[in-house]
């Protein structure tokens, strides 16, 4: 079974979101998603300063098997991207929840995450997909 962390919120499209102490939201893909993708070879993140919308495409992750869109769980301004992924996209496979995050957003309304799944709901969602 993939690692699923209890402190995160999850989307059915397999992104995770973590609300930081300063109110910003860090976004990445789940351990389950990186396992399904296989070896990640390229990550495209939104540009710092750009606006993203909840439920809309914000980037792309490509592996040896497939390319998948990355969706933002919140609306807001992109304040940081993980530049490490440009040089070492495999970091997503090695550390999807820590070193392999994709981008950070200053949300216009953090309550948009209220509709995201908690870890228990995400586990059930993954099991139902299997």
Swiss-Prot record:
Record keyword Cell inner membrane present: no
Alphabetized UniProt keyword annotations: Lipoyl
Listed CDD domains: GCS_H
Ranges for domain Lipoyl-binding: 24-106
Co-factor(s): (R)-lipoate
GO annotation terms (biological process): glycine decarboxylation via glycine cleavage system
Any one annotated GO CC term: glycine cleavage complex
Modified residues (N6-lipoyllysine): 65
SS bond partners: none
Record text on cofactor binding: Binds 1 lipoyl cofactor covalently.
Keyword Ubl conjugation included in the entry's annotation: no
InterPro entries in the record: 2-oxoA_DH_lipoyl-BS (IPR003016), Biotin_lipoyl (IPR000089), GCV_H (IPR002930), GCV_H/Fam206 (IPR033753), GCV_H_sub (IPR017453), Single_hybrid_motif (IPR011053)
Family of the protein in this entry: Belongs to the GcvH family.
Job of this protein: The glycine cleavage system catalyzes the degradation of glycine. The H protein shuttles the methylamine group of glycine from the P protein to the T protein.
Oligomeric and partner information: The glycine cleavage system is composed of four proteins: P, T, L and H.
Protein name: Glycine cleavage system H protein
Record organism: Teredinibacter turnerae (strain ATCC 39867 / T7901)
């Amino acid at each position: 079974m993939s690692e699923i962390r209890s402190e995160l919120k999850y989307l059915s499209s397999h992104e995770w979101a973590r609300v930081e102490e300063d109110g910003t939201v860090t976004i990445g893909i789940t351990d389950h998603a990186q396992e399904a993708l296989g070896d990640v070879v390229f990550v495209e993140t939104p540009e710092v300063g750009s606006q993203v919308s909840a439920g809309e495409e914000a980037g792309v992750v490509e592996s040896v098997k497939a390319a998948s869109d990355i969706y933002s769980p919140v609306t807001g301004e992109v304040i940081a991207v993980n530049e490490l992924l440009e040089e070492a996209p495999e970091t997503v496979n090695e550390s999807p929840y820590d070193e392999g995050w994709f981008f950070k957003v200053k949300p216009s309304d953090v309550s948009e995450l209220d509709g995201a799944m908690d870890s228990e709901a995400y586990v059930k969602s993954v099991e139902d997909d299997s």
